[in-house]
Design a protein with these regions (language model features):
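Domain-level detector for long C-terminal conserved domains
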Residues: 176, 180-337
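Positively charged, amphipathic N-terminal segments that serve as targeting/anchoring signals
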Residues: 5-232, 236
Length: 337
């Protein structure tokens, strides 16, 4: 009987996946893809779950489960980043909050930049004030996330109205199937890696896309120096431990650990996430600190996806999330005898 009930559950999930795919191609109007605008500073965002987030961000009400699944499939990317970096994050150092002591140190540095105090500046000459540089979020191994509508990524800027962002998509597939939209510029001394730069996607957000491996860029010092107050790495479903892709990360991970900046990682399933953690433990044992314990992502996609080559392989975008950073060795003083 238990096997039969499990079979029915799988059938229901497969039916849901099929209906969601047909819904996307139905040609209907999608009100769930109309996104909320800037957030009033007096209105606090509640990041307990998807419902409280969408409500406090003043999204149009989403009254059907299917529309909710379609909306979260895109929003999971910026909101996953925002939910970890924000000062009102659902992840904390309290018992069961998953954040470690080292994680609190790293995220506190970024939050200091992302939530600056009011400067009292104005539009005139007398109102000029020094501003912090933008927070750089390096999204490595970028695939589908690099081609998301820019309105989706602007949601990240709305969560931090006083901060500036520079999103940098890096990876050989970061411009896949987008040649008609953005032809790759030639490599020149002023643009040595042929970056596609989208300036002013929002007044506080800039997006760059580079079709290359990160370790190639790192070795040139192109993004040097790195600062834990201004830099963060994001790896969406990187497949660190997957047999087909782990070799592509062997050169990259040691370089990321050198920067001492936080590295956020998501996985399609619990197995996928645990496989990545096992691979990092094997290749960099003793060289990293865990910032956030692995577990289910509060803002995972609610829509399930099916592997066409294996119907038993069911996953969802950003199901799990964890974070780590290169180990920092604090200076110690040896008292003179």
């Amino acid at each position: 009987m238990a096997d039969y009930e499990a079979h029915l559950e799988i059938c229901d999930t497969l039916r849901q996946i099929n209906e969601d795919d047909h819904d996307l191609r139905s040609g209907r109007f999608f009100p769930e893809f109309e996104y909320a605008g800037p957030q009033m500073e007096e209105a606090i965002v509640n990041m307990t779950n998807w419902d409280t987030f969408l409500y406090t961000r003043n999204f149009e009400a989403i009254n059907s489960d299917r529309s909710m699944r379609q909306a979260t499939r895109l929003l999971t990317y910026p909101v996953t980043i925002g939910s970890i970096l924000h000062e009102l994050s659902p992840y904390s150092i309290r018992s069961g909050g998953r954040l470690t002591a080292e994680g609190l140190k790293s995220l506190s540095a970024l939050r200091y930049t992302l939530h600056p105090p009011k400067t009292g500046g104005g539009e005139g000459i007398k109102g000029l004030r020094p501003e912090a540089p933008p927070v750089r979020i390096f999204i490595l191994g970028a695939r589908a996330e690099s081609s998301l509508p820019r309105d989706v990524w602007v949601q990240l800027a709305h969560l931090f109205p006083r901060a500036k962002f520079h999103l940098i998509f890096i990876g050989p597939e970061s411009m896949a199937n987008r040649d008609d939209e953005f032809p790759l510029p030639p490599r020149a001394p002023s643009n040595p890696f042929g970056a596609v730069v989208e300036d002013r996607v929002w007044p506080t957000m800039k997006i760059s896309t580079i079709v290359d491996y990160y370790h190639t860029l790192h070795e040139t010092g192109y993004f040097y120096p790195y600062d834990p107050y201004f830099d963060c790495f994001m790896l969406f479903h990187p497949g660190l431990g997957h047999p087909a892709s782990s070799h592509e990360w062997e050169e990259t991970i040691p370089l990321l650990l050198e920067t001492k900046a936080p590295i956020l990682v998501t996985g399609y399933t619990q197995y996928d996430m645990e496989r990545d953690i096992e691979w990092v433990n094997k290749t960099a044992k003793g060289e990293f600190d865990l910032l956030m314990e692995p577990g289910e992502n509060t803002f995972r996609s609610l829509r399930w996806d099916l592997n066409d080559l294996d119907p038993q392989d069911i996953s969802c975008g950003n199901w799990g999330v964890w974070a780590f950073r290169g180990k920092r060795y604090e200076t110690t003083r040896k008292d003179e005898a």
